[in-house]
Amino acid sequence: MDKLEMHHLIMAAKARKGLSWDDLANAVGKAPVWLASVCYGMNSAPLEVATHLCEVLELDDQVAATLTAFPVKGWDKSIPQDPLIYRLYEVVGVYGPPLKDVIQEKFGDGIMSAIDFSMHVERIEDPKGDRVLLTLNGKFLPYRSW
């Protein structure tokens, strides 16, 4: 089974059971964004997490095995068409260079890890319209000289 087939089976089971990413994350003891990334095939899960998720979703051992397989990290390089994903693409396009400058002023020359990393999504109620709070928490990795 490949990661795409795994993803389709998980999404169908998730819908059939009426579960949210928060529900599934709470069931397996992981963060919702991380768990969703595993189910989309962009990360791999430890065996115990994969097995527990498959028990919750009533999926077989083949799905669990695919959840534990190392992924090929990559994505479609075209401009995103989904409006929400496009807004994130736009944020990086508009604010990426200034954000890089601010980070490097505070930390020096380097990068923010997406490996030693976590991400959280929160809903902030606001009378003018609820807001999305994204928290990206990555370890700073300085470039070294040799």
Swiss-Prot record:
Pfam families recorded: Cyanate_lyase, CYNS_N
Family: Belongs to the cyanase family.
Role played: Catalyzes the reaction of cyanate with bicarbonate to produce ammonia and carbon dioxide.
GO aspect biological process, one term: cyanate metabolic process
Gene Ontology molecular-function annotations: cyanate hydratase activity; DNA binding
NCBIfam families from the UniProt entry: cynS, PRK02866.1
Catalytic activity: cyanate + hydrogencarbonate + 3 H(+) = NH4(+) + 2 CO2
Enzyme class: lyase
Species the sequence originates in: Pseudomonas putida (strain ATCC 700007 / DSM 6899 / JCM 31910 / BCRC 17059 / LMG 24140 / F1)
Catalytic residues in the record: R87, E90, S113
UniProt keywords, alphabetically: Lyase
Keyword Protein biosynthesis: no
EC number(s) on file: 4.2.1.104
Protein name: Cyanate hydratase
